[in-house]
């Protein structure tokens, strides 16, 4: 029987491992919302299938699906992908799934953050969100893992860790008034240190331009390994992303990580700019949530890739850059397999490959 614990991971000797550490599984959630995923979510579902198949080359995949969509998902997903019935409000498993922590004795536990659909009523992306807020605990229950209910609102995509004491985030997101308005920056840092056993938080000012998540860090950077960061870069000084990336670089170059290392930066080219077409916008049902407007700029980023057991699964977003990014990733991760998946449908929904996946560490 699993328990929701009243202690803290730091108190119990647990830490959050980095994404490049060994994993036992990747969890995903099936896209279904017709007010976010165009044409009845069918194009997005086809893309999620391709992402799951790519991941499954090196890591088992579990896809959670509603009762209504279970048969459909089971038919279109390969038999080696586990399909599990679970209620959700949307399909951003990075944000709604548990952030796992591990100890030195082969044990793991989940961290269950409070979730409010990226800003609750008025500023959030959808309502209600109670099913999504329950997903992390359900995942832990299913896997037989104890969990901690963290005392703050946080999405998994708003943090990156290096596994050696350093956490990266953005001021834009974690200090946004729609998340934890009663907490100061220092108080949020204290919670992160106790909950994930990290020693240092590196605050990047902003996330990617026009990112509806209020600037999730996983759409701007990725931790390559301790002391090394892949950063979305824009050379066009007239583009709003230019200053955002420049400010991020300035912070990273002046900071040291928890171990005192200077941070090495690898520039990832920015795709596009990419914009939503009239056909793409018109295929989405109207609701009170996030509106899709023809001509609106999409928050496309190659940093939104997944590392899973010496395998990089990255989004194909722009033919002008896709191959160059593949070569750069192969250089950054020697001896890793690099797989690109056409990911525009995920981008149209507001995220990308990292956003729709959540790793379970191997212990």
Curated annotation (Swiss-Prot):
<protein>
    <recommendedName>
        <fullName>Putative agmatine deiminase</fullName>
        <ecNumber>3.5.3.12</ecNumber>
    </recommendedName>
</protein>
<dbReference type="GO" id="GO:0009446">
    <property type="term" value="P:putrescine biosynthetic process"/>
</dbReference>
<feature type="region of interest" description="Disordered">
    <location>
        <begin position="1"/>
        <end position="20"/>
    </location>
</feature>
<dbReference type="InterPro" id="IPR007466">
    <property type="entry name" value="Peptidyl-Arg-deiminase_porph"/>
</dbReference>
<dbReference type="Pfam" id="PF04371">
    <property type="entry name" value="PAD_porph"/>
</dbReference>
<dbReference type="GO" id="GO:0047632">
    <property type="term" value="F:agmatine deiminase activity"/>
</dbReference>
<dbReference type="GO" id="GO:0004668">
    <property type="term" value="F:protein-arginine deiminase activity"/>
</dbReference>
<dbReference type="InterPro" id="IPR017754">
    <property type="entry name" value="Agmatine_deiminase"/>
</dbReference>
<feature type="active site" description="Amidino-cysteine intermediate">
    <location>
        <position position="355"/>
    </location>
</feature>
<comment type="similarity">
    <text>Belongs to the agmatine deiminase family.</text>
</comment>
<feature type="compositionally biased region" description="Polar residues">
    <location>
        <begin position="1"/>
        <end position="10"/>
    </location>
</feature>
<keyword id="KW-0378">Hydrolase</keyword>
């Amino acid at each position: 029987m699993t328990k929701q614990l009243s202690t803290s991971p730091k108190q119990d000797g647990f830490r959050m491992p980095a994404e490049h550490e060994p994993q036992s599984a990747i969890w995903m959630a099936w896209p279904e919302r017709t007010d976010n995923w165009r044409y009845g979510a069918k194009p997005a579902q086809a893309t999620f299938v391709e992402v799951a198949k790519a991941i499954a080359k090196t890591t088992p995949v579990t896809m959670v699906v509603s009762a209504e969509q279970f048969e459909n998902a089971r038919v279109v997903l390969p038999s080696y992908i586990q399909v599990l019935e679970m209620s959700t409000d949307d399909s951003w498993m990075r944000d709604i799934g548990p952030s796992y922590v591990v100890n030195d004795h082969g044990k793991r536990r989940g961290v269950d953050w409070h979730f409010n659909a990226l800003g609750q009523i008025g500023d959030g992306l959808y309502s209600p969100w109670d099913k999504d807020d329950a997903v992390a605990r359900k995942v832990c229950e299913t896997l037989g893992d104890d969990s901690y209910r963290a005392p703050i609102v946080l999405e998994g995509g708003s943090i990156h860790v290096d596994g050696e004491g350093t956490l990266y985030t953005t001021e834009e997101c974690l200090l946004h008034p729609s998340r934890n308005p009663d907490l100061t920056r220092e108080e949020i840092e204290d919670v992160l240190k106790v909950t994930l056993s990290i020693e240092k938080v590196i605050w990047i000012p902003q996330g990617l331009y026009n990112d509806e998540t209020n600037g999730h860090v996983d759409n701007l950077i990725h931790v390559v390994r301790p002391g090394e960061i892949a950063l979305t870069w824009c050379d066009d000084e007239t583009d709003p992303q230019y200053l955002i990336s420049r400010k991020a670089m300035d912070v990273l170059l002046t900071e040291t990580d928890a171990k005192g290392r200077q941070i090495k930066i690898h520039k990832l080219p920015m795709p596009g700019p990419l914009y939503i077409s009239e056909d793409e916008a018109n295929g989405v049902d109207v609701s009170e949530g996030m509106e899709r407007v023809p001509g609106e700029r999409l928050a496309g980023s190659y940093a939104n890739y997944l590392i899973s057991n010496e395998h990089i699964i990255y989004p194909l977003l722009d033919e002008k850059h896709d191959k160059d990014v593949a070569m750069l990733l192969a250089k950054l991760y020697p001896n890793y397999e690099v797989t690109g998946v056409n990911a525009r449908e995920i981008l149209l929904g507001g995220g990308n490959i990292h956003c729709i996946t959540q790793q379970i560490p191997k212990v």
